[in-house]
Protein backbone atom coordinates (compact mmCIF):
# COMPACT_ATOMS: atom_id res chain seq x y z
CA UNK A 1 0.00 0.00 0.00
CA UNK A 2 1.21 3.50 -0.79
CA UNK A 3 -0.53 5.28 2.13
CA UNK A 4 -0.98 8.27 -0.16
CA UNK A 5 2.70 8.63 -1.04
CA UNK A 6 3.91 8.79 -4.64
CA UNK A 7 7.04 9.90 -6.44
CA UNK A 8 7.23 13.54 -7.43
CA UNK A 9 7.40 14.09 -11.14
CA UNK A 10 10.37 16.42 -10.61
CA UNK A 11 13.34 15.28 -8.55
CA UNK A 12 14.82 18.76 -8.19
CA UNK A 13 11.60 20.60 -7.31
CA UNK A 14 11.32 18.90 -3.92
CA UNK A 15 14.66 20.47 -2.94
CA UNK A 16 13.59 24.00 -3.91
CA UNK A 17 11.51 26.67 -2.20
CA UNK A 18 7.87 25.65 -2.41
CA UNK A 19 8.70 22.03 -3.21
CA UNK A 20 8.01 20.70 0.27
CA UNK A 21 4.97 20.53 2.49
CA UNK A 22 1.66 18.78 2.03
CA UNK A 23 1.73 19.37 -1.72
CA UNK A 24 4.63 16.96 -2.17
CA UNK A 25 3.38 13.39 -1.77
CA UNK A 26 6.90 11.92 -1.99
CA UNK A 27 8.08 13.39 1.29
CA UNK A 28 7.63 11.14 4.28
CA UNK A 29 9.66 13.22 6.74
CA UNK A 30 10.98 16.74 6.31
CA UNK A 31 11.82 19.23 9.02
CA UNK A 32 9.60 22.29 8.60
CA UNK A 33 11.56 25.52 8.81
CA UNK A 34 10.61 29.16 9.03
CA UNK A 35 13.30 31.83 9.22
CA UNK A 36 10.74 34.21 10.73
CA UNK A 37 10.35 31.83 13.67
CA UNK A 38 13.10 29.84 15.36
CA UNK A 39 14.03 27.24 12.75
CA UNK A 40 15.89 27.37 9.47
CA UNK A 41 18.01 25.28 7.14
CA UNK A 42 21.75 26.01 7.56
CA UNK A 43 22.95 23.75 4.71
CA UNK A 44 23.71 26.63 2.32
CA UNK A 45 25.87 28.31 4.95
CA UNK A 46 27.99 25.18 5.31
CA UNK A 47 28.56 24.55 1.60
CA UNK A 48 28.74 27.94 -0.13
CA UNK A 49 32.27 29.27 -0.70
CA UNK A 50 33.24 32.47 1.06
CA UNK A 51 33.39 34.35 -2.27
CA UNK A 52 30.03 33.08 -3.62
CA UNK A 53 27.77 35.75 -5.16
CA UNK A 54 25.34 34.03 -7.52
CA UNK A 55 21.58 33.47 -7.91
CA UNK A 56 20.90 36.16 -5.29
CA UNK A 57 22.86 34.33 -2.57
CA UNK A 58 26.13 35.39 -0.96
CA UNK A 59 28.93 33.54 0.82
CA UNK A 60 29.05 30.84 3.41
CA UNK A 61 31.66 28.97 5.43
CA UNK A 62 32.41 26.21 2.88
CA UNK A 63 32.86 23.52 5.54
CA UNK A 64 31.49 20.72 3.33
CA UNK A 65 32.72 19.88 -0.14
CA UNK A 66 32.27 17.21 -2.78
CA UNK A 67 34.84 15.65 -5.12
CA UNK A 68 35.19 15.61 -8.89
CA UNK A 69 35.50 11.83 -8.65
CA UNK A 70 32.02 11.67 -7.10
CA UNK A 71 30.61 14.11 -9.67
CA UNK A 72 32.09 12.14 -12.57
CA UNK A 73 30.53 8.92 -11.25
CA UNK A 74 27.06 10.16 -12.27
CA UNK A 75 25.69 9.42 -15.72
CA UNK A 76 25.71 12.42 -18.07
CA UNK A 77 21.94 13.07 -17.96
CA UNK A 78 21.48 12.29 -14.26
CA UNK A 79 19.21 14.95 -12.79
CA UNK A 80 20.73 14.41 -9.33
CA UNK A 81 23.77 16.40 -10.50
CA UNK A 82 21.62 19.53 -10.80
CA UNK A 83 22.65 20.94 -7.43
CA UNK A 84 26.25 19.79 -7.55
CA UNK A 85 27.31 23.29 -8.58
CA UNK A 86 30.25 23.23 -11.00
CA UNK A 87 30.39 26.95 -11.76
CA UNK A 88 29.50 30.17 -9.95
CA UNK A 89 30.07 33.90 -10.03
CA UNK A 90 32.43 35.14 -7.33
CA UNK A 91 32.06 38.43 -5.46
CA UNK A 92 34.81 39.97 -7.62
CA UNK A 93 32.78 39.14 -10.76
CA UNK A 94 35.00 36.28 -11.92
CA UNK A 95 33.58 32.91 -12.91
CA UNK A 96 34.84 30.01 -10.82
CA UNK A 97 34.56 26.57 -12.46
CA UNK A 98 36.41 23.31 -13.02
CA UNK A 99 38.80 24.94 -15.49
CA UNK A 100 39.33 27.95 -13.21
CA UNK A 101 38.72 26.42 -9.76
CA UNK A 102 40.64 28.80 -7.55
CA UNK A 103 40.70 27.49 -3.99
CA UNK A 104 37.00 26.72 -3.83
CA UNK A 105 36.36 24.19 -6.60
CA UNK A 106 39.78 22.56 -6.63
CA UNK A 107 38.53 19.41 -4.86
CA UNK A 108 35.11 19.29 -6.46
CA UNK A 109 31.73 20.92 -7.00
CA UNK A 110 29.61 22.58 -4.33
CA UNK A 111 27.15 20.00 -2.89
CA UNK A 112 24.32 22.54 -2.76
CA UNK A 113 21.62 19.81 -2.61
CA UNK A 114 18.89 22.35 -1.90
CA UNK A 115 17.93 24.95 -4.49
CA UNK A 116 18.86 28.58 -4.56
CA UNK A 117 17.28 30.72 -1.85
CA UNK A 118 17.68 34.49 -2.05
CA UNK A 119 17.18 34.66 1.72
CA UNK A 120 20.69 33.24 2.12
CA UNK A 121 22.91 36.29 2.44
CA UNK A 122 26.28 36.21 4.10
CA UNK A 123 27.32 33.40 6.37
CA UNK A 124 24.07 33.61 8.34
CA UNK A 125 22.75 31.10 5.83
CA UNK A 126 19.11 31.02 6.94
CA UNK A 127 17.15 29.19 4.25
CA UNK A 128 13.42 28.47 4.19
CA UNK A 129 13.86 25.20 2.28
CA UNK A 130 12.77 22.31 4.51
CA UNK A 131 15.54 19.73 5.05
CA UNK A 132 14.34 16.38 3.73
CA UNK A 133 15.08 13.39 5.94
CA UNK A 134 13.15 10.56 4.29
CA UNK A 135 11.16 10.23 1.08
CA UNK A 136 9.41 7.52 -0.90
CA UNK A 137 12.41 7.06 -3.21
CA UNK A 138 14.42 6.02 -0.12
CA UNK A 139 11.78 3.39 0.67
CA UNK A 140 11.94 1.99 -2.88
CA UNK A 141 15.73 1.76 -2.83
CA UNK A 142 15.85 0.25 0.66
CA UNK A 143 13.28 -2.36 -0.34
CA UNK A 144 15.20 -3.10 -3.54
CA UNK A 145 18.41 -3.66 -1.58
CA UNK A 146 16.65 -5.90 0.94
CA UNK A 147 15.02 -8.01 -1.79
CA UNK A 148 18.19 -8.32 -3.84
CA UNK A 149 20.54 -9.15 -0.98
CA UNK A 150 18.34 -11.27 1.28
CA UNK A 151 19.59 -14.82 1.88
CA UNK A 152 18.27 -17.20 -0.79
CA UNK A 153 17.01 -14.30 -2.90
CA UNK A 154 15.01 -15.71 -5.82
CA UNK A 155 15.02 -14.44 -9.39
CA UNK A 156 11.53 -13.07 -8.72
CA UNK A 157 12.91 -11.13 -5.73
CA UNK A 158 15.72 -9.74 -7.88
CA UNK A 159 13.34 -8.77 -10.68
CA UNK A 160 11.13 -6.96 -8.18
CA UNK A 161 14.19 -5.19 -6.74
CA UNK A 162 15.29 -4.07 -10.19
CA UNK A 163 11.77 -2.79 -10.94
CA UNK A 164 11.97 -0.52 -7.86
CA UNK A 165 15.40 0.75 -8.93
CA UNK A 166 14.14 1.39 -12.46
CA UNK A 167 11.16 3.33 -11.12
CA UNK A 168 13.63 5.78 -9.59
CA UNK A 169 15.92 5.75 -12.64
CA UNK A 170 12.98 6.49 -14.95
CA UNK A 171 12.06 9.54 -12.89
CA UNK A 172 15.69 10.68 -13.17
CA UNK A 173 15.56 10.24 -16.98
CA UNK A 174 18.15 7.45 -16.87
CA UNK A 175 18.24 4.20 -18.80
CA UNK A 176 16.84 1.15 -17.04
CA UNK A 177 19.18 -1.48 -15.63
CA UNK A 178 18.93 -5.26 -15.52
CA UNK A 179 20.44 -7.93 -13.26
CA UNK A 180 23.69 -7.93 -15.28
CA UNK A 181 24.24 -4.31 -14.26
CA UNK A 182 24.38 -5.25 -10.57
CA UNK A 183 27.77 -6.85 -10.08
CA UNK A 184 28.62 -6.21 -6.43
CA UNK A 185 26.89 -5.85 -3.09
CA UNK A 186 28.08 -2.24 -2.84
Question: What do the predicted segments below correspond to?
Answer:
Residues 1-41, 76-186:
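Acidic/polar-rich alpha-helix caps and helix-coil junctions
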Residues 43-51, 101:
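Short intrinsically disordered coil segments
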Residues 48-68:
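Short, cationic low-complexity segments
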Amino acid sequence: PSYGYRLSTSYTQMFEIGGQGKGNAELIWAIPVNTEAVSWNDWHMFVLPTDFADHGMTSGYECVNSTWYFYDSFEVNDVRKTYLVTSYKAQDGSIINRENPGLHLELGPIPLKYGYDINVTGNGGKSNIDPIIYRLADVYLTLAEALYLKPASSETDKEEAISYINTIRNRANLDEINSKDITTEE
